[in-house]
Amino acid sequence: MEQRRSGRQKCSKGGEKLIRISQLKLPITHTKAQLEKKIAKTLKNPGNSFTYEIKKQSLDCRHKNDKIFVYTVDVTIRDEQKLAKKVNNNNIMLTKEKPYEFPSPGETPLLHSPVIVGSGPAGLFCGWYLAKAGYCPIILERGEEAEKRQKTVENFWKNGVLDPESNVQFGEGGAGTFSDGKLNTLVKDPYGRNHEVLKRFVAAGAPEEIIYQQKPHLGTDVLVGIVEKMRHEIEEMGGKFCFRSKVTDLIVENNTLKEIEINNDKRIPAQVCVLAPGHSARDTFEMLQKRGVYMEPKSFAVGLRIEHPQEMINMDLYGEPENELLGAASYKVTHKCANGRGVYSFCMCPGGYVVNASSEPGRLAVNGMSYQARDSRNANSAMIVTVTPEDFPDKGVLGGVEFQRDLEKKAWELGEGKIPVQLFGDFCKNQASEALGEVTPCMKGEYILTNVRSVLPKAVGDSIEEGVRAFGKRISGFDREDALLSGIESRTSSPVRIVRDQELTANMAGIYPCGEGAGYAGGITSAAMDGIKVAETVCRKYAAIKNN
């Protein structure tokens, strides 16, 4: 018996027929041989050889003393249809493995290389697939290459020197590079883009387990290497990267894109521009508004980061303070408040850090980040509350941007440029904290004890207090007095949506809004999927440059 590596696929043109087995339950200490034995026993087929691929692995901790992994596997075996009928088991079914297929090029001549604005997941994946198909894309990134960017960010955390163009938000890899690197998504895609994204990450150096894990993640240290590898592959396939190259204007004639201005100076001709600027490209949104690109305000969420000892979270989920096999435990919680608003955890970082994620002078924002090992002493997540355009009426399309900036300015002034921190007990009393309890911060960037609640709108502060107390009834100790709150968490998603039609173009020909910044994704995987989707659209219309 042989386990087919999850990152590989053997597929005939029409797809390979397989037997899918779900609900295979094994102790968390099981071996590969035990899994194979379980598969053979389930199929009532102890003799014949087979190959299998793990499609999903989830953890069941409902019984703390009997924690198990639950698997779904696809099995390749002779006479699979006959065998499936023979075995009377509701957890066994025939399935067909259909590989992802990128479309064939169209016929419209492409006179200039397509330009991609931004090298986050959306821009990077769009660029990779266009390069592979022969379109020689040009990727414009306002920030630095990943390795240089990492040093710039670390210098900011250490010395407080902010580079507005290369920071936690801007630079190769996008904002997700300095996060937990979560890869799970709620987006259901019948075309297989989700699996394709994970495969591409594995090919670029990610652990193969992300293909089937219930909650896959990469970590900042791994992500840096992955985006560098993808950049080199794009360049080898004919693509070009231009760093420190901010798009400052779009030159449009007769409602059609003609040129792109870079750094208020250089202009390049452009027939296709994929706009994937990220959710923090506020100056880009302002430029687009001036140029008449249709945008609309959208809901997003704001709040604070909360820190607890990781051992406390482990105890609640695992029943033990540490488990080497399972790593740091995570949680996901939601609550509907008495005031009608919802409060929920976001971007939970097991064994992670709260980081200063600012990108504008005089304004302060935070985010959560983990390394691959998730081995810091604290767990953190955002406690956020949804805000809608009704919370900033009469402010126009960029009202959400103004709302974010106002909160970040107050946070910067409150902390004098440092991350404002407050104990939950003091938060409930609306008073400044003066001393830490047993929980000590795990932070990147300097912090200061103060009254962070004073920054928040009353409805948001009240919702967070009620939510944390409610979560304390589900996770023991969540509402402890010395849990740490810090802020402001304001960059959860884009405050605008750049309107696009069924052909994925804006109201001006040649402009393709894409990814999280354009309002069509939320997180690394969904942004990458949208990048592939836009690349497909460009490909279906235009002929490849290498074949011209």
Outline where the language-model segments fall.
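Short, Lys/Arg-enriched N-terminal segments with co-localized hydrophobic residues
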Residues: 4-17
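Residues forming the flavin
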Residues: 16-69, 73-548
